[in-house]
Amino acid sequence: MSLSRLSSPQTFSRVFIVARGAATGHAVAPSSDNSIGYFEKIAYRFKGIPLPTETEAPKSMFDACNKEWSAPELLPSVPKDFKEHPDRDLTNYPYPSRPMYPPKTRLLMMPDSWFTAFQKVTGTSGPYLFFGGLFAFLVNKELWVFEEQGHMTVGWILFYLLVSRTAGYKIDAGLYKDYQERVGFFKGLIQEDLKEAVDFRKTSAAQTASFAALKEGMPTSLKDSMQLQLEAAYRKNVQTISNEIKRRIEYLKETEETKARFERDQLLKLINDSVEKQVSQKDFQEKFLQNAIQQLKGIAV
């Protein structure tokens, strides 16, 4: 039972008779929401047509159907004047280039170059007749034997066509985006290396300039340094001599003071010993007593 039996003929005509490319053109539904049937709303939803109550067109899963993807920027090629060695023969042995698109084919898998060789002699239909006859001959003579599941090849071909026409555009765009990200990553590494090389070159240039300035001012700087060293050595020697003279003067002063003190002590000791020796004699004591008695007598008179 088809869906057309559930809707009126007018609704059926509006649902299934739609111009090609309506999904990508974002057509507008009729202004009256009541005139849109249930199945027609489903059809508009699948085709990406906004309803009167919607301000923006919904994102449809069939927007990318039957679209041919083309790269906004081709793959980078090797420069013509690039050689990794001067002896490299670029004429006979050029660098291999990575094609952006696969080579042109016919019947999904046969190279176009096989057909163009026949067209010069047999015309446009000649290659198809030749390969068709060759295929029929191989199958008829059982030189090319199909397996029991050989008929499933038709299903795989249909599946390939379905996937390539529905999701092929998004797959190609995603792969190209991943490729650009990968190339950007490697370019970032190259830029970092170049930045390090530039920084190293700048640092080397600054060091070279500083060495040149140092070389130019080396005699003057050496002379100034020598004068400073001589002055420092002179001040050090003067300070050493001053300390040594001060130490020797203090030593001589202490020596003289010690010598004078020793002589004074010895002299006092000698005097004391002499006095004590004289006082201890009896004659001296008798003379001293007589002298004292006479003085007392003189005082009494």
UniProtKB/Swiss-Prot annotation:
It is found in: Mitochondrion; Mitochondrion inner membrane. Residues 1-21 form a transit peptide. GO terms for molecular function: proton transmembrane transporter activity. It comes from the Eukaryota. Disulfide bonds: none annotated. GO terms for biological process: proton motive force-driven ATP synthesis. GO terms for cellular component: mitochondrial inner membrane; mitochondrion; non-motile cilium; proton-transporting ATP synthase complex. This is ATP synthase F(0) complex subunit B1, mitochondrial. It comes from Caenorhabditis elegans.
